[in-house]
Amino acid sequence: MKILVSNDDGVLAPGIKILANELSTLGEVKVVAPDRNRSGASNSLTLTQPLRVKQLDNGYYSVDGTPTDCVHLALTGFLEPIADIVVSGINEGANLGDDVLYSGTVAAAMEGRYLGLPAIAISMVGDNIQHYETAAIIAKQLVIKLSANKLPSQTILNVNVPDLPLNQIRGMQVTRLGTRHSAEPIIKEYDPRGRPIYWVGPPGIEADAGAGTDFFAIKTGHVSITPLHLDMTHYKLFDHLSNLLNEICIEN
């Protein structure tokens, strides 16, 4: 088995090394990841400048681009042969609910799926992560399962793991995305020259975090596994929208 590993925390982040080492027992692992932390990069591609790649002493490839750049590069000509599966992570922090819209970790998995491969995004939930090995072992088990049981097309798995020793994990739950309240206001500061600068505010607190959500699974000590569908079309709205549009008269 050939496995492509990427992330958004950067090629030197502890999570990606632990993940790659664990997955190496299953086959050939190639690591292609950003040269620095690119958290929040979402699905962005670099289109206005070339990408530069450096191979590190440990064999990992460092890319001066986004997580999506890394996976796109790896699967469209940089790596030969291409991988059988993409695993993104282990992210240092949660990717729950609305987080997936901004997450470079999830985006790297999405890019793998866009390019035809099964893909998993895996994140650790906690403030000071101590148990990356737990997530690495869970990722390995999921890769084994997916090698024999293919996911439907247009689908990835978003996996969140409590920062606990493996023997304290209470099980796995298939979940839906919860939601957060709106983000906190921006933070305004001033640089040494007195000019205003702005920081994006913290994420909002949980809004929909009841039973069945990814938030709830984590709170109860379970691994949250949320299947995400890349086709974002809202099919149930078709009839209503068609009726609405029929009422609009377009005249030349």
Curated annotation (Swiss-Prot):
Keywords: Cytoplasm, Hydrolase, Metal-binding, Nucleotide-binding. Binds 1 divalent metal cation per subunit. It catalyses: a ribonucleoside 5'-phosphate + H2O = a ribonucleoside + phosphate. It is found in: Cytoplasm. It is an enzyme of class 3 (hydrolase). SUPFAM superfamilies: SurE-like. Its EC number is 3.1.3.5. A divalent metal cation binds at D8, D9, S39, N91. The keyword Cytoplasm applies. Its cofactor is a divalent metal cation. Nucleotidase that shows phosphatase activity on nucleoside 5'-monophosphates. Belongs to the SurE nucleotidase family. PANTHER family: 5'-NUCLEOTIDASE SURE, 5'_3'-NUCLEOTIDASE SURE. This is 5'-nucleotidase SurE. It comes from Legionella pneumophila (strain Corby). The lineage of its organism: Bacteria, Pseudomonadati, Pseudomonadota, Gammaproteobacteria, Legionellales. The gene is surE.
